[in-house]
Amino acid sequence: MSSTNQSSVTEFLLLGLSRQPQQQQLLFLLFLIMYLATVLGNLLIILAIGTDSRLHTPMYFFLSNLSFVDVCFSSTTVPKVLANHILGSQAISFSGCLTQLYFLAVFGNMDNFLLAVMSYDRFVAICHPLHYTTKMTRQLCVLLVVGSWVVANMNCLLHILLMARLSFCADNMIPHFFCDGTPLLKLSCSDTHLNELMILTEGAVVMVTPFVCILISYIHITCAVLRVSSPRGGWKSFSTCGSHLAVVCLFYGTVIAVYFNPSSSHLAGRDMAAAVMYAVVTPMLNPFIYSLRNSDMKAALRKVLAMRFPSKQ
């Protein structure tokens, strides 16, 4: 059997963000704090929406799904980083690496699809308010979420199967803090043109189509707001989209910076900085972005916290 095949590499080494011990300790602390904030913040959002009947609407249904996906997204990478630091190890098995890559891609795709679905919800609410309840039915909302899961898993399974066929020879060091597609393609000693072609074609379609839907939705929303006679009324309508727009810019800005450049132009430091933004920082910020200027959400969160920590008389 040839020595230059897939079985010659049984594990990869995740080099992480830094090799300096002091920086590693600081990064461990930062990642731990951000991960705890991500889990706590998003679970509070889910709990608040589930316990407050006023929030049982399509917008908050999609938001609770986004919060669930964000917890899963962050949990795909950060716990492994923390565990490796505690154990003093950099290793991840070949199968573990592909598994991590698969779930990272699935949850990333789900973020993408849910942001598009949420923009459609805002489009219907602002542009067709009288037909909102008849258009955004519970059946449609469930169908949109389930359909997103199906498409995300099918898309990611295709890319993982293409990745699994590659051969990895002597070099098994990944200059990243998790298993990502671009570093793995660079390590492969096989022809990766098909993988790169699929990322830039099929992968781009899956990523760009929801983004185009978001743009179209906001063009219609902007036109509808500009037609409102009262500036105050128009601003109030558009302000409900502000949180969603902030998350869209944060998510797509970092993803495009990493995944839609030629592989030869990728710089490890820049890619990792962008990866920290979309895989760690964005899931942490989403609960704050969606709740800071939302009075209904803040009231629901106060209610949940009051139930958990009742004030002493």
UniProtKB/Swiss-Prot annotation:
Cytoplasmic topological segments: 51-57, 121-139, 220-236, 293-313
UniProt keyword list: Cell membrane, Disulfide bond, G-protein coupled receptor, Glycoprotein, Membrane, Olfaction, Receptor, Sensory transduction, Transducer, Transmembrane, Transmembrane helix
Protein localization: Cell membrane
Name of one Pfam family that matches: 7tm_4
Stretches in topological domain Extracellular: 1-25, 80-100, 159-196, 261-272
Membrane topology: Multi-pass membrane protein
Tissue-specificity statement: Olfactory epithelium.
Organism from which the protein derives: Rattus norvegicus (Rat)
Transmembrane segment boundaries: 26-50, 58-79, 101-120, 140-158, 197-219, 237-260, 273-292
Record has Cytoplasm as a keyword: no
Name the record gives this protein: Olfactory receptor 1f45
Family (UniProt): Belongs to the G-protein coupled receptor 1 family.
Disulfide bonds: C97-C189
Domain of life: Eukaryota
